[in-house]
């Protein structure tokens, strides 16, 4: 120390008071710079700790959004099950309508068979009536022939034989009486035939009326059955069309829901990926914070060593160089802190944009599937 003081006095001969004042000023400036560095680093650490708490809140919000999306997926599955139940009910109604149609066809077949039986009976009655008319005509023609023969025989008797004629007349009288009896019998037969013909005609008219009535009723029933069949066919066609439309709408809805679900799952994966990336970024930021703390400790140690060297060397020029070096280090630390703060603000803005997009997507899904 005495040799160094001697060399300083030989190079620059300032007094001892000036050196003491310079040393005090340098010490005060170093203390102020150290306090400023410590305050800036404390503020950076506080901001980073606050940022990590916000990230924890954002993760909780992401978990709630994922739960809401799972609830929406459950709602969509329940809607799909309800549409499937409606399709099964329509299929059951279609099968019941088909069974009713087959039953109506069987009834129509039975009624057609009854109509054919009635027609065959009517044809049989008509044939019997024609036979009775033919028998009546034949009996009438035979009676006319007998009268003609009787007249011829009477004339022959009158011309040829008187006794024999009397005998013949007696015979004729007998024959006439017999003929009269036959005529009376014929009249009785005619009356009976007429009565039977009237009964047959009345029966025929009754049968015709009954047949017409049955034909009208059958026509009405056929028309009713035809209209019912048309209505059943119309209902079946409408039910089939409605079922086709429902199936098509269900398929379109399922496709749209699958597309939306795929989009939601993709966005969910993207959000999970972003959350993982943000976790990695937080880990990196924490590592950077630890590095900054280490740098701060090294800077404090460097400052301490610089002060010790300054006290040991007590050279103004060398101390100014050390101060500049420390100032450069402080500027570098401040710049790194500013960069870190800008990155954290950008990351926070990006996270808020993603959350707003997720809220809009959830609002759209709630609007589409209330």
UniProtKB/Swiss-Prot annotation:
Q: Which UniProt keywords apply?
A: Coiled coil, Cytoplasm, Nucleus, Phosphoprotein
Q: Which family does the similarity line name?
A: Belongs to the CCDC89 family.
Which PANTHER family does the annotation name? COILED-COIL DOMAIN-CONTAINING PROTEIN 89
Q: Where is this region: Disordered?
A: 1-26
Q: Where are the Phosphothreonine modifications? A: 12
Q: What is its main location?
A: cytoplasm
Q: Which InterPro entries match?
A: CCDC89-like (IPR043450)
Source organism per UniProt:
Rattus norvegicus
Q: How does it assemble?
A: Interacts with HEY1.
| Entry protein name | Coiled-coil domain-containing protein 89
Locate the coiled-coil region(s) and give their ranges: 36-346
- Entry GO CC: cytoplasm; nucleus
- Determine the domain of life of the protein's source: Eukaryota
Instruction: State its location(s).
Output: Cytoplasm; Nucleus
Query: Could you tell me the gene encoding this protein?
Result: Ccdc89
């Amino acid at each position: 120390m005495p040799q160094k003081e001697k060399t300083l006095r030989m190079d620059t001969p300032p007094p001892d008071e000036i050196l003491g004042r310079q040393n005090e000023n340098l010490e005060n400036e170093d203390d102020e710079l150290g306090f400023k560095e410590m305050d800036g680093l404390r503020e950076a650490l506080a901001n980073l700790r606050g940022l990590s708490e916000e990230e924890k809140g954002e993760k909780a919000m992401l978990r709630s959004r994922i739960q809401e999306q799972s609830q929406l997926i459950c709602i969509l599955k329940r809607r799909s099950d309800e549409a499937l139940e409606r399709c099964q009910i329509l299929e059951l109604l279609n099968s019941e309508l088909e069974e009713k149609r087959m039953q109506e066809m069987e009834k129509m077949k039975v009624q057609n068979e009854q109509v054919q039986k009635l027609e065959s009976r009517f044809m049989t009655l008509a044939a019997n009536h024609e036979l009775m008319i033919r028998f009546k005509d034949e009996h009438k023609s035979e009676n006319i022939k007998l009268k003609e023969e009787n007249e011829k025989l009477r004339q022959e008797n009158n011309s040829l034989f008187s006794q024999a004629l009397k005998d013949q007349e007696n015979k004729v009288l007998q024959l006439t009486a017999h003929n009269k009896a036959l005529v009376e019998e014929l009249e009785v037969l005619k009356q009976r035939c007429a009565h039977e013909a009237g009964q047959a005609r009345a029966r025929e008219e009754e049968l015709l009326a009954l047949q017409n009535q049955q034909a009208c009723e059958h026509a009405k029933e056929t028309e009713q059955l035809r209209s019912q069949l048309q209505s059943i066919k119309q209902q079946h066609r409408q039910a089939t069309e409605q079922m086709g439309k429902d199936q098509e709408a269900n398929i379109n809805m399922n496709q749209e829901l699958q597309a939306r679900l795929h989009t939601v799952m993709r966005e969910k994966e993207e959000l999970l990926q972003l959350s993982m990336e943000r976790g990695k970024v937080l880990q990196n930021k924490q590592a950077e914070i630890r590095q900054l703390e280490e740098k701060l400790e090294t800077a404090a140690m460097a400052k301490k060593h610089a002060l010790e060297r300054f006290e040991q060397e007590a050279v103004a020029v060398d101390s100014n160089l050390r101060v500049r070096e420390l100032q450069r280090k402080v500027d570098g630390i401040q710049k790194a802190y500013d960069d870190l703060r800008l990155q954290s603000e950008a990351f926070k803005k990006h996270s808020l944009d993603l959350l707003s997009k997720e809220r809009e997507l959830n609002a759209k899904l709630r609007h589409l599937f209330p």
